[in-house]
Amino acid sequence: VAAARSRGIGLQTFKVGPDYLDPQLLASASGRPCRNLDLLLCGAPWVRQSFHWWSNQVPLSLVEGVMGLYDGRGPSSEGSSAAIALELNLPVLLMVEASRQAGSLAALVRGFRDHEPKLNIAGVVLNGVSTSRHQQLLQEAMGSIAMPVLGVIPRDESLELPSRHLGLVPPAEQEAWPQRLSQLGQKASQWLQLEKLLALMANPNQNTPQTQTQNQAQNPISWSLGTVLSKHKAHQQATHQKSEQRPCVVIAKDKAFHFCYPELPEWLEALGCQVQWWAPLEDQALPEACAALVLPGGYPELQAKELSQCKRSLGAINQHCRLGLPLYAECGGLLLLGQELLDADGEAHPMAGVLPFRAQRGALSLGYRGATPLRAGLVLRPGEQLQGHEFHRWQLQETPAQKAAEQAWRLEGWGVLARVEGWTNAALHASWLHLHWGGCPSIPLRLRDAAVAANAKRQTTQN
């Protein structure tokens, strides 16, 4: 990606699955927001609209996979990188760990190629090659199965990217990241057959049988908004009446809170909201015009001590909730709402004190979840079925604090026991579950409506 950008070529990156961290690195390398393609969270129609719309904006597109090529939900390939490639009719470049192998690699790559005959594996990049002799052995092995080798990456410790328990360290926290990115681009030009790779990444909308349909792709949010509003004509009329009202929706964003899909603020802006960013770690009050607050996920545990000392920020969140103003929180944002947060050393740090729990490290909770709302709340309605993703290592211990909300929904997933989770009331949604609003467009619509109502109530009170 960095090599293409250094040549002045526009490239749109995508990431398979619900990841928040890899997209930050890809966005930094391309200079454009990275878009997640998740069949399980968003469904195939959204994935198609998103891919074709954003890939139409620039000459090149690259989709980074997730896990192994065929790894999807549970033991299946549902939602996998292969499923995305088949859905979008894209060629696949297989990154192969080649260290300590030679002829065996031919069997492995042939297995990947033949496992799904409809999949077009256009070539491989060999990673971890030790010597020129090793490279020759590998290339002959690939030649024996007629598999093009489009790159050879030697063992190089400088390529390793720093990581922690939930994934790679974001670019904003990596030392000398711009210089590192430039060096990576130079090495890519040296080790990869860039001309052939750039040809593979050329806008697929220009050379596939579905060209007419793909070139008519809409902005996915506009398309989704039109779809959901057409189902609710009464709501569509109300939306038109509210179009001149622009409530302020504040989104937390700093080192502690940055797990936010680019579509989240785009949805709110498309619905007529004014979006403002707010850094809790800077210990500041919420913007005066704040009609609704969004607390996304992130790493509050790494800044637990600093957050606990941000009395103005924590007090602002508490006051926001006591006034009954809308608040939407996911995962790390949920942690901020508890009574206490225990850091890695077991030291307790006071949080905003909105919800009756203290949080401490626990077992890994990871995977897609089907969510069934138990009651109506800020953004949920009984009878709906939603898909989300859970990824954390926390357990919550209830405290005797005053009950502020009811349990939100029942979660089910592959290989895990069903359980009731989250908090909700008319002005609050707080849960471990990450949602992508491309798969549940009613959520931002309801949040916007709540912000409009809160704004109107405030103006009436002031008058």
How should these model regions be labeled?
Residues 62-64, 93, 125, 294-296, ...:
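Structural motif
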Residues 247-322:
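Phosphate-binding active sites in nucleotide-utilizing proteins
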Residues 102-209, 219-236, 242:
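Internal gly/pro-rich beta-alpha loop/helix module
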Residues 159-207, 230-235, 240-241, 245, ...:
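Amide-donor transfer/coupling interface in amidating biosynthetic enzymes
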Residues 300-377:
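Cysteine-nucleophile active-site neighborhood
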Residues 1-16, 123, 133-139, 265, ...:
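N-terminal phosphate-binding or glycine-rich loops at protein starts, especially the Walker A/P-loop
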Residues 2-88, 96-119, 132-136:
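ATP-dependent carboxylate-amine ligase catalytic core
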Residues 15-16, 149-157, 274-282:
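Beta-strand->loop->alpha-helix junctions that form or flank phosphate-binding loops
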